Amino acid sequence: MPELPEVETVRRGLEPVLSGARLARVRANRPDLRFPLPDGFVQRLTGAKILRLDRRAKYLLVPLDRGDTLVMHLGMTGRFEIAAPSGTIRPGDFAREVTPDDKHAHVVFETEDGAVVTYYDPRRFGFMDLIATDKVDRHPWFAAMGPEPLGEGFDAKTLVAAFNGRKQGPKTLLLDQKTVAGLGNIYVCEALHRAHISPFKPAGMIAGKRLGPLTTAIKDVLAEAVEVGGSSLKDFAATDGALGYFQHRFRVYDREGQPCPTPGCKGMIGREVQAGRSTFFCPVCQV
């Protein structure tokens, strides 16, 4: 599933084409994705002007001039492709012929200046909804969500409060969207390794002085992943069709049995399953 860096990569790819654009035509090739599309989906979007493109955790938020916000989640295999007007070159575009009868091309957005943005989703785990803009923050998807890890609202104090007295491991708590928004399995494994913290140690037993470095590791890992376009595992690609490259920088994720890259550490990367997800770690330098 695309995590925060992948969704941010998609947002940045769509922004030059959609921000400030007016939707001349919207086509929904089926009535549902993971959930049914909202009533009047096509009619409510057609003719609307896109004010900007935002991201909250792993959601794309598209406020419109009509008072609605288009909320989109990529699920497991959702992706966008962009075809710009002939002769127009824009950052993030993937110039290709759009195939209207592609069975996985579920929603097509056409702007007044001729750009075509197509949403593909073979497994249909993604979804789209329209929510009144002034109610987005109170919507059940967002109301209890923690701070953005790349924002100023996330710091060591956030983790001190979240970890205090807790018996669960830090990975479990970091994956809880109420603690911090948008973190997923890959980047939590990587951040814990950089901070040399065991994913299995009860969070309440981790000294407070270690949470500053963990906060920094989380921010650094995410920022580096965004910079190189995320991690291309299985189905993810950016809007220009390019693959992300952060997977080439993994220190522990998907590296079971390989030497730990920490200088001076002689450990081997291990893997254990926690709550149905693989946890990659070094048993020597993560304590």
From Swiss-Prot:
Binds 1 zinc ion per subunit. The active site is at 2 (schiff-base intermediate with dna), 3 (proton donor), 58 (proton donor), 277 (proton donor). Its cofactor is Zn(2+). DNA binds at residues 104, 123, 166. A zinc finger (FPG-type) spans 251-287. Its EC number is 3.2.2.23, 4.2.99.18. SMART domains: Fapy_DNA_glyco (SM00898), H2TH (SM01232). It catalyses: Hydrolysis of DNA containing ring-opened 7-methylguanine residues, releasing 2,6-diamino-4-hydroxy-5-(N-methyl)formamidopyrimidine; 2'-deoxyribonucleotide-(2'-deoxyribose 5'-phosphate)-2'-deoxyribonucleotide-DNA = a 3'-end 2'-deoxyribonucleotide-(2,3-dehydro-2,3-deoxyribose 5'-phosphate)-DNA + a 5'-end 5'-phospho-2'-deoxyribonucleoside-DNA + H(+). One of its GO terms (molecular function) is damaged DNA binding. Keywords: DNA damage, DNA repair, DNA-binding, Glycosidase, Hydrolase, Lyase, Metal-binding, Multifunctional enzyme, Zinc, Zinc-finger. GO terms for biological process: base-excision repair. It comes from the Bacteria. Gene3D superfamilies: 1.10.8.50, MutM-like, N-terminal (3.20.190.10). Belongs to the FPG family. Involved in base excision repair of DNA damaged by oxidation or by mutagenic agents. Acts as a DNA glycosylase that recognizes and removes damaged bases. Has a preference for oxidized purines, such as 7,8-dihydro-8-oxoguanine (8-oxoG). Has AP (apurinic/apyrimidinic) lyase activity and introduces nicks in the DNA strand. Cleaves the DNA backbone by beta-delta elimination to generate a single-strand break at the site of the removed base with both 3'- and 5'-phosphates. Monomer. NCBIfam families: fpg (TIGR00577), PRK01103.1 (NF002211). This is Formamidopyrimidine-DNA glycosylase. The lineage of its organism: Bacteria, Pseudomonadati, Pseudomonadota, Alphaproteobacteria, Caulobacterales.
